[in-house]
Structure formats: C-alpha cells, structure tokens
C-alpha cells in the first residue's frame, strides 16, 4: 500500500490529474487489508479513491473465502486486467483507467527481524480511443 500510495499521489501531481479523470483506479494486488491502508494513506493527503478503486486481489476471490491479503500480485493483476477490465476498455464501457501493478518482497526472516518490507508500484494509464 505505501508504494501504491506514493505512485498514485505522484502520478496525479505530475500529470495534473484528478481522481475523477479516471473511471477506475486499479491495483493488483493489495487485497482487503492493503486497500484499506491505501485509502487511509490517501485520505491523509486529501485524496479519496474508494468509489473508483478496484483491486485485482479482491476481485479474484469472493468475500466468503476470507482472503484478506489478496492473491499473487503479478498473477492476479495480469489475469484480472486481461479477462475483466480490458474487454470493458475495448468496448468503451470504461474509458480511462490508472492501473498499478503492485508488489512486495515478502521475507519471513526480514519481518521477524523487524525490517521493513520493500514494495513497488508501477503505473500505466490505459484509455479507450474511438
């Protein structure tokens, strides 16, 4: 979530964009826990994305499966983007998205030693063009 937060904040600032300029802001994957953390971090900067945000990890599982931390970032981001969002963009149902592939280097040893978890978020804008 911290990397997605920084990337979204920087993107909006660098390109003079607003959240409202996007039909969806898509992450892959933060899961339920990470999405809530992202909302909290962005709200601290006066940025509200909850009504436009979709997370590939959250979409891949039903709420009954109780997978609070999502799926495999690279796997679910590619799967959900290509099977769910790209057809909607191609048809024009969705016009513009900010897509962030998120990832973290999860090391049980580092976590047990109290070290931080390195994370990254790459962003790309995908648009439907008539």
Where are these regions (language model features)?
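Claisen-condensing/thiolase-fold acyl-transfer catalytic domains that form or cleave C-C bonds
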Residues: 23-130
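Phosphate/pyrophosphate-binding loops at sites that engage ATP/ADP/AMP, CoA/4′-phosphopantetheine
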Residues: 7-21, 88-89
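Loop-centered beta-sheet repeat module
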Residues: 1-2
